[in-house]
Amino acid sequence: MSKKIYLSPERRPAPHGPYFGHPGVWEHDVTVRIAEKTAAALRRCGYAVRVAAAEDPLRQRVAEGIAWGADYYLPIHTNASSSTTAEGKAQGPEVLAYGAPGGGSWRACQMAYDALMELYPRKTARGVRQNTTFYEINKTPMLSVYPELAFHDNGADADWLLQNEGPIAETLTRAVCRWFGTEYRPPQEAAETAESAARRAALEADRDRWQGLYRALKEQITALAASLE
């Protein structure tokens, strides 16, 4: 049975979370797009996935994840270090965990952080941080991995986030695969598999057609031979 992954992108719409240097771009819209791409990647890798409805409050999202029997609860957010319109100075991913270092949450969050840092281009070390106040961390009985992907109030980070929505989704998927010990299937590999399946189906159809023609011809020859006796 497939593991169940529940995705919860930022629920607050504009004007929450403006992206520095990108007028009209907001955290909600970006994380919803990343969540949809992550869902597609996870399904490609064999996982069952649900994405929270954009309008659902946190309580409803957590309740839905619990009722569904989610194995892994994945909020998707981008970060901010300033509450003003000035550019923030902080950069880089961080992942929020509950419990002590070495526990299940911390280890899963470390996997997500390590995967993000394989993609992120700058040398930062925000790491995994303990959080016991966020609702989607302290009210989720299943494993919760809470990435803050980068800082949307920093120009360089905002650019990186917008230029890498697809790669970020693949990175989050790789982290899930690493946690559960399953194979990550890259998009190209999946496409090649689908192409191979289509090619095989076409060859099998040709084979069946030629076999049918052979049987018909054999019957005609047999009938002709019988008529000549």
Predicted regions and their residues:
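Long, well-ordered alpha-helical scaffolding segments within enzyme catalytic domains
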Residues: 33-44, 102-121, 158-186
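Active-site histidine-acidic residue metal-binding/catalytic motifs
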Residues: 1-62, 68, 89-91
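A short, glycine/acidic-enriched catalytic loop
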Residues: 14-26, 80-111
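Acidic, proline-/serine-/threonine-rich low-complexity intrinsically disordered repeat tracts
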Residues: 187-197
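N-terminal catalytic cores of peptidoglycan-degrading enzymes
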Residues: 3, 61-62, 68, 72-75, ...
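Alpha-helical coiled-coil heptad-register detector
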Residues: 195-198, 202-219, 223
